[in-house]
């Protein structure tokens, strides 16, 4: 298993419009989102967790996004091998996101993404 502890750039393109952001999780050191926003980063994708386990820095990372005024989305690393496990993951995500403050929900303008990297899962899609 490879664990990346650096910030992962994320970009989005549409109709000659370009925005850039980062992907963060518990594997990153503290991230100064205010500084990154000043450098031109528009958004951050925050790892919610994996399967039904919360990322240890999820709430801290969300609060940092709120404090910096940076828009964000979240992603869940999937370990689901069947529809029942996928439902467990979805219910976990919904339950966790329902606890966010109104201020955090207002800044969550990017999607809830499903991160599927395991070949034994993605090959069955």
Name every feature range the model reports, one short phrase each.
Residues 3-19:
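Sec-dependent signal peptide cleavage junction
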Residues 15-125:
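Substrate-binding cleft of extracellular glycoside hydrolase catalytic domains
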